[in-house]
Amino acid sequence: MTINDSRLKRHPLGFLQADPMPTAQELSDYYASYYQQERSNYRKSYTAQEHAFFDAKLAQRAALAEKLRGTGTPGRFLDVGCGEGFALAWFRRAGWHVEGIDHSLAGIKAMNPDLADAVTAGDLFGLLDTRIGASEKYDLVWLTNVLEHVIDPVGLLERLRRLVAPGGVLAVTVPNDGSAYQEKLLADGHIPERFWIALPDHLAYFTRDSLRAIAGATGWDCQEIIGDFPIDLFLMHDGSNYVRDRMQGASAHRARVEMELLLAEQPAEAVNRFYAALAEVGLGRNITAFLTPRD
């Protein structure tokens, strides 16, 4: 599929990238200002229903990761770009030894301050290189909504390949952007522009096929890809189109949370099969690839 947009170019592996790409210094300055001015997406609080939603999604993805590991025992968990620390908290409760890295401690201090001692702040690539140099290995690495933010997604996945232990798993979640569905929305006039292009926050844009391609090129075997609730289906209906009418955003989010919690009443394996089918046809606002190191 061809996407003609002057802001993006197609990488040889199929994903879309910002064009031109900011320099590392420009990006560092941007995020320094971003956190200093409290412009991040972190909320001051979440409802009990939202916390249950976070836990439900973590439980589903953890179930699939554990099925691939096949050990049934907790191990070492690394969350790269751990944000507010909800994954760290969930896995610690499940008995794992947890570590997190992030550009800032703002999120973890706001939502899970008791886990701040498990988190190191700084440049993600530098922190990963330090762990590689120390021959650290992890049984499960979590990379949620991070790959799209970095200048060098190929280099990031290559580094993580050196940190996952034999038999371990890397779970990579990215927005499902540049999809055939999004182009259909634009072509039919449901959206006025490619709303999903969010520069300089998002520098790379992935679909199921391009996520699989970059994984394969960086030493990983892709075992499974699942989607999540396809909230952008609301954009085909005038009464719920949250791009044209921002006032619809909160109700769309509530519907997503309620539907996800309803699904969470079913066995995680069944829910994951449902979301794998959605991903296979290009749907799901986010997609998660479960990767194992190639021998």
Describe these PLM feature segments.
Residues W96, D117, G168, W220-D221:
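A structural micro-motif
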Residues M1-T144, P153-L157, G227, S240, ...:
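Conserved N-terminal segment of class I S-adenosyl-L-methionine
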Residues I151-R162, V169-R294:
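S-adenosyl-L-methionine-dependent methyltransferase catalytic module, highlighting the catalytic core
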